[in-house]
Structures are given as structure tokens and as C-alpha cells.
């Protein structure tokens, strides 16, 4: 069945029909979904979703474009006091969330971001939080704080290694720095996925040689996706996973509309044409790959 290795069902784009959509995914051939954390404010709801849906798993992490909103660089997020019965959270996450809201300094050697780190660690103690992500570097915007992003990337790689969890990496306009940090921080010891891969086939080979998987989504179906099609042809099938990044990056013919996990089939069909396989073979192989990464399949 389809394994969507990177989705954002906590996004407000799904507020109107989230329950109906998620409840119908199995009928549309979707067996597993990993809901990707992007910021502190997303983590509570992601955890709630993992408890509500058997097939849905989650991650804990801070997106590079959210890194400046953490630690000393942010106001506190709006979070009401929670009780374990109300939200169904494990006690570690409950305690971390409430301490985070109160702004409590948890350790004597506190530094900017320690509360966020404690929350990530608490999330990883939950049985269905399977990875650290989405983390990485994004230099697309002019006001990018590269040092802050690098600091958070390094911290979160360290947490992943500590917990023996895979990472999934967001990298945009930061090819060299991302690979350099992956090597310097020994991220290959954690392993994981290079999400929404957008670089050359030569760069893909560097990651595959380190043991990483290449995440491919709806962009593969676009007419102007020549470079990604070259990557897809070059990377061995046993190092490719499928993803949506929904609600973003819907495949053709749905480009510009809201994406969801059932639409992965369109990406699988294009990848199948490139690889000389059937769409069902692509779905099966990429499911097996994702199972190896996240360790969730029964």
C-alpha cells in the first residue's frame, strides 16, 4: 500500500474536512502516513492525530524557517494549560508542554532553545513519534539567519542520534552547507530521508552513499521537472521513498490544488514509467523502503 513519508495533516488547509479525508485514505490505497512537524506549535496536534488514527505516525522537529521563532528569538506560543485526560498525551509531553508555556527554566545551564529541545525529546518518548524532522537549512529568503538555522540543525541531528531515530531533511538553496553539516554532525548514524529532493543526481549520489533515502513527490509529474526526472532515473529504487508534502505540491493534473496522500498514485505512475516498472511495483518497493526508514510496518 501507499506509504506517504511526509505529510502535514495538522495544517489548517485540512480543518474543514480532516476527519473525513483521513478516515477515507485506506479505501484509497494509503496504508501509512508520517505527519511531519514544522514548529513547536504543531507538535501537540500531531501527537493527537497519531493517537486518533492507527495508520498515522508523527515526528518532532523545527523547520529551518521556524528556527528564528524559537528560544530567545520568539514570543511564547499561545498554549492553554493541558491535562492528560483532555488531550491523551503521555505525561512527559504534558509536563514539557506546560513547562514550555510557563517559560520555566528547566536546567541550570539553560540556553536559548533548551525548552524546545526538551519538548522534542519528550515527543520522541511517545511510541508513534518515529523521526526528527522536518529539519535542515533553507536559504531561499533574503532575511535568512543562517547561523540560527545551522545551530538548530546541529542540535536536532544530535537529538536524533541520541534517540536512534531517523531524520528527514529540508534543504533549499543550501546544497553545499546541508551536505557539509550532514557529514560534520555524523547524521548518517541516524539515517533518514532527504525530503522533496531538488538538487542534482550527483548530489543525490552523495546522500545515497551515506545511506539516506531520496524523497520524491508531486513535482516529479510536472513538465518542467527535468532535473528531478534525471535524479529519479539515476537513484536506485531501494533508496527512493514517496511523499506528498500535502497540502502542498499536488501532482499533475491537480497542480495548484490541495494535495493529499491518495494522490501519490500519480507520482508513482510517473516514477514507474521512468524505471520501467508498474505503478504497483513502485508503490510496493517504496512502501518497503519507508518501513525500513521508520520501522513502523507490521
Where are these regions (language model features)?
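Mid-domain alpha/beta scaffold segments of enzyme catalytic cores
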Residues: 1-298
